């Protein structure tokens, strides 16, 4: 008999690809979706399955109406459906970096996780929690997988609430003596074969601004406030899905950095995208140097449009992968090359669907 999991966040970028990978491995999915209208839920699911290549697996997915912000996830399903579950996989989250009051982050990332854990306790089920490598916040140096709160400060409310939610998971596992797997992906972009993605967020916002501005630059030089030697830890979403699914199947509790062991530097990215976008008149400069001279009009546009991501161009820690490397040692799962070919596919796909 095939295993069945309860999955939150199936229409998100991580949850959608992870769901398809698990379906291909023989797992059935009970998908929690907020849509009160079943037709609307089906349409949203159909869209992501078409993008992720999982349309032929749809009969192994059952949609159930619920809401992680509610007690018991707002579930009104028959008890026998929940009894056949082998685990809960929690992917749903508010991923916006900026929000004035932070209510959505608190409700989704903190309260939502607590509600998932309470249901898992009631059903005595193991939990898989998709966190983020960037709960490290403003830390520098090496971040180990067993470290969570070491007094770090954060760049935004997304990081801080994801850190709080992960702390809840570890505390829950200790108190209930139930297994918990925590997955910490870094920056996750489109899949490696065709560059496909379900959502255009994160680095995509920055790339879209550049694609709009470069044709208007003429002979102007621009400076970009970014430390050339700072790394940007990027992985394709299909690597995230394969690595995560393999780790989940092993069933060994722990925290796993699903990250790039050899991330590119900002200088590397500058060279790649200068070729892809035809951006030849640019310089990466340290922020203090950037601020010493008034930005020109194009520099100002880039800064304003991408301000929320600026901290990530200036600093990044190194993510230790001891647990992940051990777990994947016999899995044959390799990180695809992060090169011009890959990033070219991302841009081609984004442009082909008009970034939506």
Regions found by a protein language model. Give the residues of each.
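N-terminal Rossmann/SDR dinucleotide-binding element
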Residues: 1-87, 91-94
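Amphipathic terminal alpha-helices
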Residues: 4-5, 30-33, 318-356
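Conserved Rossmann-fold NAD(P)-dependent oxidoreductase catalytic core, especially the SDR/UDP-sugar
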Residues: 86-90, 99-103, 107, 111-157, ...
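A conserved pocket-lining segment of Rossmann-fold NAD(P)-dependent short-chain dehydrogenase/reductase
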Residues: 150, 194-195, 205-239, 243-246
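Active-site Tyr-X1-5-Lys
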Residues: 153-186
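Glycine/proline-rich active-site loop of Rossmann-fold NAD(P)-dependent oxidoreductases
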Residues: 191-204, 246-256
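A hydrophobic C-terminal alpha-helical subdomain
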Residues: 212-225, 289-334
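Mid/C-terminal beta-alpha module of Rossmann-like enzyme folds, strongest
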Residues: 243-308, 350-353
């Amino acid at each position: 008999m095939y295993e069945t999991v309860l999955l939150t966040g199936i229409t998100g970028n991580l949850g959608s690809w992870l769901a398809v990978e698990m379906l291909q491995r023989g797992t059935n999915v009970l998908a929690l979706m907020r849509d009160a209208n079943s037709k609307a839920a089906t349409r949203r699911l159909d869209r992501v399955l078409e993008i992720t290549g999982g349309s032929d697996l749809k009969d192994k997915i059952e949609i159930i109406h619920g809401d992680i912000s509610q007690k018991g996830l707002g579930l009104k399903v028959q008890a026998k459906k929940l009894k056949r579950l082998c685990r809960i996989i929690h992917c749903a989250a508010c991923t916006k970096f900026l929000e004035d009051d932070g209510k959505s982050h608190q409700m989704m990332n903190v309260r939502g996780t607590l509600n998932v854990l309470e249901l898992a306790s009631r059903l005595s089920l193991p939990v898989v929690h998709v966190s983020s490598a960037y709960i490290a916040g403003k830390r520098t140096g090496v971040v180990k997988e067993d470290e969570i709160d070491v007094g770090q400060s954060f760049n935004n409310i997304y990081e801080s609430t994801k850190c709080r939610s992960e702390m809840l998971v570890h505390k829950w596992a200790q108190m209930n003596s139930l297994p918990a797997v925590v997955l910490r992906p870094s920056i996750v972009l489109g899949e490696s074969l065709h560059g496909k993605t379900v959502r255009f967020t994160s680095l995509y916002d920055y790339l879209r601004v550049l694609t709009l501005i470069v044709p208007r630059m003429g002979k102007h030089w621009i400076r970009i406030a970014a430390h050339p030697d700072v790394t940007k830890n990027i992985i394709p979403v299909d690597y995230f899905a394969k690595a995560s699914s393999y780790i989940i199947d092993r069933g060994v509790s722990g925290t796993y950095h699903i990250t790039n062991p050899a991330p590119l530097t900002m200088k590397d990215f500058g060279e790649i995208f200068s070729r892809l976008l035809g951006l030849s008149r640019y310089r990466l400069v340290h922020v203090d140097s950037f601020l010493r001279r008034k930005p020109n009009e194009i520099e100002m546009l880039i800064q304003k449009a991408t301000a929320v991501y600026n901290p990530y161009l200036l600093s990044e820690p190194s993510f230790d992968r001891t647990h992940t490397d051990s777990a994947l040692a016999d899995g044959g799962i390799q990180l695809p090359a992060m090169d011009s070919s890959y990033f070219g596919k991302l841009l081609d796909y984004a442009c082909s669907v008009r970034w939506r």
